[in-house]
Amino acid sequence: EKWGVPALWYNSWYDVSIGPNLALYDHATKSGVDAEARDNQYAIVGPSVHCAYGSLGPNFASGDRQLGDATMDVNGEVWKFFDRFLKSKPEAFPSTTPKVRYFSMGDNQWKTSQEWPPKAAQETRLYLHSGGRANSVFGDGKLSFSAPGNEPADSFAYDPKNPVQTIGGGDCCNGGVVVPGAFDQRLVKVTHDVHIYTSDILKEPVTVAGFV
């Protein structure tokens, strides 16, 4: 379906719908009914949880993870966007505004791009390996850049009376059953109904930006 209007997209890394939202943003930039619609899609992606953009500020934390200064004037950006497209004040939200502003967790800073994924991003394929025993962190699951050969399948026993515990992550709207955000996953990784695939130790920092 064609996209018909300029838009300012607010997203959160720990929202349950971050993947589909960014896919829709990408769709809007390519399927606008005209150049105005296609060329005026803007996205801001912060490290907050669902609908918590207003919490972005100095000394920001998501779950257990300290992320430094994540300040973003959320309301101010909305007003400026409205001034440009609803009140014909182009100087309020100039055309030089970056198309995408996203918070890079790890180096803990806001970055900009004119597209998503960023132009410098390289699509990389990773493969799951094991000897058939990828269960828990004590298993033999590996994550590799090499395609697997003739390896046995991994399996686990599912017990609905004892489901896998969920700790953090992207979530919303569950009445507080799960608190979204970044949390230590070691309690989950020791259970045998979870498959774990771990890469070799990285020799240098790696930035992940794009669709996963």
Predicted regions and their residues:
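Active-site-proximal cap/loop segments of hydrolase catalytic domains
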Residues: 1-94
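C-terminal, loop-rich substrate-recognition/catalytic regions characterized by aromatic stacking residues
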Residues: 53, 59-212
